[in-house]
A protein has these predicted regions:
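Ala/Thr-enriched low-complexity intrinsically disordered regions
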Residues: 227-228
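Conserved small/polar residues in nucleotide/adenosyl-binding loops
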Residues: 218-223
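Serine-esterase "nucleophile elbow" of acetyl-processing enzymes
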Residues: 2-68
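Alpha-helical cap/lid subdomain in secreted, periplasmic
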Residues: 26-34, 51, 59-68, 74-217
């Protein structure tokens, strides 16, 4: 095992030296467990997979990856494709974020309308999880949602049902309740990880608009280490 991949670690160093770290890991005379991992992303996932591979190799797992096209996580899960069907994953990781929420509360919405949006959003994910479970019969790791990087309602954003913070907290609780009731379904808690890093830095609008990364690239080792654990 490499000490560079043990907590606490230097994210910038790992990103910069990922090729040499991988080479050192592969040079180790270690027998690893092969695993096929499908990464279904709501944003760009190339470098996430690159870092995820390092942490898995360091933990004694030899991964091969299927990577969905940009933003095609739901379509791949629901309808599959020739490549994914041939791949046959041992584990599915769904990388989504606040930016993948399709419908957010508006100030003019009634409580009933907001609850309908919540229910529709949750069912969008639930039907996908159930389809994956029925198709592949393997563990599923699902990101929850980071808090919004801006608050339209200020300090009331988490208390008023019109607030996006309130909405995200409810969604995260619904995800957690589902995980508690279903085996082989796990949450990768990016809500906590983004808070530790800092929401302003995590949201990184430049990286989103330039590369469609849902979070600052330098945060990659943090959520990926969470997923591998």
């Amino acid at each position: 095992m490499l000490h560079e991949l043990e907590y606490p670690f230097d994210s910038e160093y790992i990103l910069k030296k990922s090729k040499s770290l991988k080479r050192r890991l592969l040079e180790e005379n270690t027998q690893r467990i092969p695993k096929k991992i499908a990464v279904l992303g709501g944003s760009t996932t190339h470098d996430i997979i690159r870092i995820l591979e390092l942490f898995l190799l360091n933990q004694g797992i030899e991964p091969t990856f299927y990577e969905s096209e940009y933003g095609m996580y739901w379509e791949d899960a629901m309808f599959g494709n020739e490549e994914l069907n041939a791949f046959g994953p041992d584990l599915v990781y769904i990388h989504t974020s606040f930016r993948n929420l399709r419908s957010l509360p508006e100030v003019k919405d009634s409580r009933e309308q907001v609850e309908d949006k919540l229910r529709s959003e949750f069912e969008h994910f639930q039907v996908m999880w159930e389809k994956l479970a029925d198709t592949w019969h393997c563990p599923i790791i699902q990101d929850n949602f980071e808090l919004p990087y801006y608050r339209l309602m200020g300090n009331q954003d988490g208390a008023d049902f019109h607030g996006r913070t309130w909405y995200v907290n409810r969604m995260n609780q619904m995800f957690a309740d589902y995980a508690a009731e279903h085996q082989n379904f796990l949450i990768n808690d990016i809500c906590y990880q983004s808070a530790v890093y800092g929401l302003d830095e995590w949201s990184a609008p430049f990286f989103w608009h330039m590369y469609k990364y849902s979070c600052l690239l330098y945060t990659s080792p943090s959520p990926r280490d969470g997923a591998t654990s």
